[in-house]
Amino acid sequence: MEKLDSLQGLRFLGFFLIFLNHAGWLLWKTKYFDFGARGVEIFFVLSGFLVAYNYRDADFAYDLKSSFKYMWSKLQKFYVLHMLTFLVVLYHMERHGFKYPDGVHGFIRDVFLNITLLKGWYDPAKFTFNGVTWFLSCILFIYFCVPHIIDFFKSKKWRGTALLSFLILFMLKMTFDTMGYKMGMNPWSGVFGWYCNPAYRLFDFLLGYTGFLVLSGFSGELSKKKASLLQGSMLIFYFAACRLFDTQWVPAPFILLTVLLIFTFTLSGGIFDKLFGNKLLIHLGNISFELYIVHQVNINLMNHILDELLDHNNLAVFLILLVISILMAEFFYWKPVKEFITKTIW
């Protein structure tokens, strides 16, 4: 399991599913399945998978200081872009005389939660301003936990520990999903929400992390034909399950399928090397984090303008919104801009 370029292509696929969730109404009236839920699952599980791949044997300090230091190093890479999108939405609201539904108190509360990236912890605020940045609340908490996660599995015979941990985590997630999504249970109604809560999303990350530790021992050499057949079959099965069981399943089985799908992407010599491991998709995967942060603001602020300019050509509006988002992400991913943000501003 040495070449993981195709996983960047999968990362872009995850983003594209999220983009479809937010802009797909331009193309069809009914969604084929919950694109957004599946897309963010790919993001969380893939993050755990790659952290395990990169750091499973690393010497990582795991005290409180190290957790904050690691989290801070990650925060520096996206916080400025987060704040820019937040300010753009704030300006748009002020310019158009938007009346905040929760009044002044709610406005101040939600501004604070957005600036501090805590809005994922408070369910009523999860989609405020740049709605998609609830993900940043989750990933920041996960970054804080990473040093402890690495140490926990490194200090043990990790293959057996990982398998047991994976099974326990999956059963716990299945239980919580059933409680939340099927039974409507909520431990703190009005404050807690399952979908965007960072502690809940840590399960997705951990299943990706332990999934790598379990499956890395099964990545033996396969012929090109067998690898391609396995990859193609898994991708078809994944999307078929997304379509057929969209409303029947809770998220946990989809997480399991996502882990298996990611594993097939690591098989060398298969068709995914060309489909997802080409230079274009690798690059789009590299900028997917920036794409994620900017895309919904672009959709919300520009779709009406483009709709008028393009004479209600929905497909053209969809494609232009995607291109604009890519161009903006390219700018913020551009090395001089990244260095200015991380070395000059910070």
Task: Give the positions of each predicted feature.
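Short, motif-level signal for alpha-helix interfacial/capping segments enriched in acidic residues
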Residues: 2, 115-119, 181-182, 266-276
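Hydrophobic transmembrane helix bundles of membrane-integrated enzymes that assemble
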Residues: 160, 164-168, 206, 210-213, ...
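Membrane-cytosol interface segments of multi-pass membrane proteins
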Residues: 1-179, 225, 287-288, 305-346
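Interfacial loop-to-helix transition and helix-capping segments at the boundaries
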Residues: 4-5, 29-40, 125-138, 177-207, ...
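Alpha-helical transmembrane segments of multi-pass integral membrane proteins
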Residues: 205, 231-340
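A cytosolic-side transmembrane-helix exit/cap motif
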Residues: 56, 62, 180-186, 271-281
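Internal transmembrane alpha-helix with an interfacial aromatic "cap," most often the third helix
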Residues: 144, 151, 208-219
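Aromatic/glycine/proline-enriched transmembrane-helix motif characteristic
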Residues: 219-237
